[in-house]
Amino acid sequence: GVTGFGFDLVRYLFAGVVDGR
């Protein structure tokens, strides 16, 4: 997500969902 680039990357890689909360 826009408010969590770091988490966004992890989410995208593992979950495949762009949601960096």
Curated annotation (Swiss-Prot):
This entry's Gene Ontology molecular function terms read: 5-methyltetrahydropteroyltriglutamate-homocysteine S-methyltransferase activity; metal ion binding
Q: What is its main location?
A: cytoplasm
Class of this enzyme: transferase
Q: What is one GO cellular-component annotation here? A: cytoplasm
The record's subcellular location field reads: Cytoplasm
Cofactor(s) this protein requires? Zn(2+)
Quickly give the catalysed reaction. 5-methyltetrahydropteroyltri-L-glutamate + L-homocysteine = tetrahydropteroyltri-L-glutamate + L-methionine
Tell me the route in metabolism or biology where this protein functions: Amino-acid biosynthesis; L-methionine biosynthesis via de novo pathway; L-methionine from L-homocysteine (MetE route): step 1/1
What Enzyme Commission number does this protein have?
2.1.1.14
Does Cytoplasm show up as a keyword for this record?
yes
Could you list this entry's UniProt keywords, alphabetically sorted: Amino-acid biosynthesis, Cytoplasm, Metal-binding, Methionine biosynthesis, Methyltransferase, Transferase, Zinc
According to its UniProt entry, the protein's GO biological process terms are:
methionine biosynthetic process; methylation
Family classification: Belongs to the vitamin-B12 independent methionine synthase family.
Q: What does this protein do?
A: Catalyzes the transfer of a methyl group from 5-methyltetrahydrofolate to homocysteine resulting in methionine formation.
> Can you name this protein?
5-methyltetrahydropteroyltriglutamate--homocysteine methyltransferase
Q: Name its species.
A: Populus euphratica
Organism phylogeny? Eukaryota, Viridiplantae, Streptophyta, Embryophyta, Tracheophyta
